[in-house]
A protein has these predicted regions:
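Membrane-proximal intracellular helices of multi-pass ion channels
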Residues: 1-2, 6-206
Length: 209
């Protein structure tokens, strides 16, 4: 029914904007590029949507952007401003976000993706939404290089982007090891990777099966 279609579209839109990653669409390979691209773009916007909301909308309602940022964020941005003005902070974070995005898209292309897929998967990788454009997801490409790019940039995007800004400004990578959130993220990623490697069958076992 028409209402059912509206519900599905609303669910898909909110899933992308909140980077939830859930989808109600099937037959992703048959969807037009424009629709898949829009899904990925919404995810990419959602990846840094809090800053847009704080800087562009809330001040018009009489709510300071700095108030919601302090209430809703974690990491260095919660304790002190990265720049004197919130608008400048938003600009700095978006420059870093855009830089990571461009590097991710180029890396995907060098790993074997067409530019079309590289750009769309870049948007869902750096936003950590996981929205796919193929029913088989990354298995569609059957490429260890593509998988490696996804892993690296998901690890990078898992860090607080305000922390990336501080590392870039101070030129000191040890800042990552001084932040509790970053250390927890590194430890969790390392632990999960070790568990997956331990439980995954070896190439010899796969050949036997």
């Amino acid at each position: 029914s028409e209402m059912c279609i509206r519900d599905r579209l609303y669910f898909e839109m909110m899933s992308c904007l909140t980077t939830t990653g859930a989808t109600v669409f099937t037959g992703l390979d048959k969807l037009p590029v424009s629709l898949n691209g829009w899904r990925c773009f919404l995810s990419w916007i959602g990846g840094m949507g809090l800053i847009v909301l704080s800087v562009a909308i809330l001040p018009l309602l009489g709510v300071g952007g700095s108030q919601i940022i302090k209430a809703e964020t974690t990491g260095p941005l919660k304790e002190h401003r990265l720049t004197p003005r919130i608008a400048d902070t938003a600009k700095a974070l978006y420059i870093i976000y855009l830089g990571v995005s461009v590097a991710c898209a180029i890396s995907y292309h060098l790993a074997g993706m067409e530019w079309e897929d590289a750009i769309m998967h870049m948007m869902t990788t750096v936003s950590l939404s996981g929205i796919g454009t193929h029913d088989a997801s990354f298995a569609y490409f059957n490429s260890p290089a593509v998988d490696a790019v996804a892993i690296v940039f998901m690890l990078i995007s898992g860090f607080n982007f305000s922390l990336h800004f501080m590392v870039w400004r101070r030129r000191n990578f040890l800042i990552y090891l001084q932040d509790a959130e970053a250390k927890a993220w590194i430890a969790t990623a390392a632990l999960m990777s070790a568990c997956l490697l331990y439980t995954s069958p070896s190439p010899r076992d796969r050949q036997k099966s």
